[in-house]
Regions:
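Substrate-binding groove of N-acetylhexosamine-processing glycoside hydrolases
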Residues: 1-201
Length: 201
């Protein structure tokens, strides 16, 4: 039988905010019920307008770029920390380019706020926190892929990244607690704190 299985995986502490599931749920409904499924850009345009009230009709296309732009992922970070399997690394340049792409997307997301109705603007906050976390993971990937020297400059940069991760975790925990109970939050905190400690070691 033909059908659609629409899932929201909770691996590695389920780091994603619940709001991020909305577009996937709409995709699932459209693919299940529509006799003619719009092309990707068109369905994203429709969702932007109908679900978010985005008069520019571009928001969901911007969001769609996020998940394909990072190279050192949360799954990579968890697997490498827990040593469950070998995690191959890209070059420092690949991670640097990924961080730059994510910064550009963050700028587009900030710009998109002006096209949203007031009641929808607050939803962008969760995406901005997620993007910042992804950018920091690319910087972590650069450290892991780079020369592990302990000169003063490198040490200072590593300590600065550790501090950025901890500040990000503070914001992330506040966001988590605004919609969820503690649940798996301690696992996410453990991963971030372990890497922060490692960066300072």
């Amino acid at each position: 039988a033909d059908g659609v299985l629409n899932t929201d995986w909770g691996d590695c502490g389920h780091i994603n905010h619940p709001d991020f599931s909305l577009v996937g749920m709409i995709y699932g409904a459209a693919f299940s019920w529509n006799t003619e499924i719009p092309v990707f850009d068109e369905i994203n345009r429709q969702i932007s307008r109908i679900a978010y009230g985005d008069v520019s009709e571009t928001l969901v296309s911007v969001l769609a770029k996020i998940s394909v732009s990072w190279k050192f992922t949360w799954r990579n970070a968890v697997d490498r920390l827990e040593q469950l399997r070998e995690v191959p690394l890209y070059s420092m340049e690949v991670y640097r380019n990924a961080a730059e792409q994510l910064e550009e997307i963050k700028g587009e997301l900030y710009a998109s706020v002006s096209h949203l109705p007031v009641e929808q603007k607050k939803q962008i906050h969760a995406y901005l926190i997620a993007l910042q976390g992804m950018i920091l993971l690319q910087k972590l990937g650069m450290v892991l892929a780079g020369d592990q020297t302990s000169d003063e400059t490198c040490s200072g940069q590593r300590c600065a990244l550790a501090e950025e991760l901890e500040y990000w975790l503070y914001d992330y925990k506040a966001l988590w607690r605004s919609v969820s109970r503690e649940s798996e939050l301690f696992r996410i905190q453990h991963v971030i704190c372990c890497y922060a400690d490692w960066l300072r070691s």
